[in-house]
Amino acid sequence: MLVTDFDGTLYRGDDPIRHYARRAARELAPDRRRIVLDGVDQYLAMGAAASAVPEAIDGWEAVMLLARRLGVDPDALQAAFTDTRVHMLSEACSLEVPSGYAELLQQLRAGGVRVVLATNSPAEGLDPLLRRLDLLPLVDEVVAGTGKPAGLRRLLQRELGGSGTVGAAGLAPERVLVIGDHWRNDIEPGTDIGAFGAYIDRFGRADGPADATATTVEGLLEPIRKWAATAVPTTAPAAPTTPAPLLKALPSETS
């Protein structure tokens, strides 16, 4: 089983980040607005080396931290985020699906690997975005509002048969791969239980160990292929080719 992140992994692009920054800062005075926009541009170009907001995990957090620092309140930030998710549904928003990764997921599914998309993005608006980017044929299951990192731990527990959840797959940890660009959310929950961790460290943060690390998903394709060659039984059935159902949320620990 391969568990993939969404933002910055299955798709990428800085247009949503810049839209979020513009929307969040639009009520600020011009000089303060410029600090936010320039700081976000610097972070996207330099990552952890950016002096403006080196502590940010990704571009979304860079916007949030800079905007809060300059006086944008939480309600305005949430409105800016919601507006950005709507913007992402439009062809006016430039987004890229890494073709090599998409092709690899198709190959893995044909070879019997179950692909799960686990994202903290809310279910609302997610399905049309997945359809806009033609991503549903690449995955077997979509888990929206995962609540990573804790929610990813629960998802993995379900798949490893440790939670008693109906449908638990009973996989061995070494037959699970987690991939994403946020080490604490996407990688650590997997490597903690012995899964293969593939970490996209675009911004040079080096937040923690992984079995494979690269600045782009393209740098992880060969390690993923090598993992699949040893982790997937040669007799594994091919994954279904029908579009994945959209799950609104991962069941809680008490549900």
Where do the PLM segments sit?
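Active-site neighborhood of HAD-like aspartate-dependent phosphohydrolases
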Residues: 1-41
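Short, acidic loop-to-helix structural element flanking the phosphoryl-transfer center
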Residues: 3, 57-61, 88-116
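Generic enzyme active-site microenvironment
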Residues: 3-5, 118, 179-180
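Small/polar loops that bind or transfer phosphate-bearing groups
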Residues: 12, 117-118, 144
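A metal-dependent, Asp-based hydrolase signature
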Residues: 38-88
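Short glycine/serine/threonine/alanine-rich loop segments
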Residues: 72, 113, 195
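Charged linear interaction tracts used for macromolecular binding and regulation
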Residues: 77-79, 94, 120
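Asp-based, Mg2+/Mn2+-dependent phosphohydrolase catalytic module
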Residues: 102, 106-107, 121-255
